[in-house]
Structure formats: C-alpha cells, structure tokens
A protein has these predicted regions:
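Positively charged n-region of N-terminal signal peptides that target proteins for export
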Residues: 1-4
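Bacterial N-terminal signal peptides
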Residues: 6-16
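A beta-strand edge to alpha-helix "cap/lid" segment located at domain peripheries
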Residues: 18-55, 62-151
Length: 151
C-alpha cells in the first residue's frame, strides 16, 4: 500500500511538472506555427473542405456563432456546414495578429474577415490551444462586425 501511495504521489508530481513546462520553442516559432495554422484553417473555407475545417477544432471548442454560443466540435461543425454548402466561399479571413502565452500552450489570433468582393465585413478572434506537439486547435472563436461608418 505504501509503495502504491508513493507511486501515485510521484506520478502526480511528474504530471504537475509537465503541465507547467515552459515553452519548448521560441516565442517567434510558436507565433509562426499559430499563424500558419490559422491560414490553413482559413484555406479549408476557400477549398470548401468541411472535414479540414473540423480537424482544427478542439473537442471542447466554443464558437460564438449565431444567437447562442456553440459548445463542442459536433455542434460547431453542424452549424458551420451551411457555410460550406455552396460552391463559392461566403467569406474569407486571415491572421493579422498572433500572440502566444509564455507557457506556450495558448495563443490568440485575430484579423479581418472579407466578403467575396473583398470588402471588410467583420473581424475574428480565435484562441488556440497546443494539444500535442505542433498541433494547435481552436478552443474559442468569435467574430465581431465592423462599423461601416462614414466620416
């Protein structure tokens, strides 16, 4: 029993150490990975590939799409399927800003969203989580309309 308790405590200590490991890559490399992942995510819309879109979502993702937040990968994919139903993409996006926590496990990407004619119609913000080495997935995503204000 004592050996089991020691093994359990040792395992917990080891896991706690892993959870707080510092970034194992440079911050610039991490930012580049997230930006590249965001561009690949956006390419899924241009390529009309809903399965590729789904591959970028964490299982417990939350998207602020529509009147209430969508919780979970399945709900997000079901809601977003309508954006992939037509031959032409209804919008496009690209990252302009990327920031990564010092811990290296969470990142923010944000940028413009354009309609098919290239007009800025919205801005997005996505929170990415590093779920495996070199594997970033979205945990939160939210868009916001832009003002079409005239001076």
């Amino acid at each position: 029993m004592r050996a089991l308790l020691i093994a359990l405590i040792s395992s917990c200590a080891l896991l706690a150490g892993c959870a707080s490991q510092p970034l194992t890559m440079s911050p610039e490399l991490a930012k580049q990975q997230v930006a590249d992942t965001e561009r690949a995510f956006a390419k899924s819309m241009a390529d009309r590939d809903l399965n590729a879109f789904a591959s970028f979502l964490s299982q417990d993702t939350v998207f602020f799409s529509g009147p209430t937040p969508l919780h979970g990968k399945k709900a997000v994919v079901e809601f977003w399927a309508k954006f992939y139903a037509r031959p032409a993409a209804p919008f496009s996006w690209k990252p302009e800003e990327v920031e990564v926590l010092a811990s290296g496990n969470l990142a923010l990407s944000s940028g413009p969203v354009y309609n098919p004619e290239g007009k800025l119609v919205s801005r997005f913000s996505s929170i990415w989580r590093l779920e495996a080495p070199n594997q970033w997935r979205i945990v939160f995503d939210k868009g916001s309309e832009v003002c079409d204000c005239k001076p």
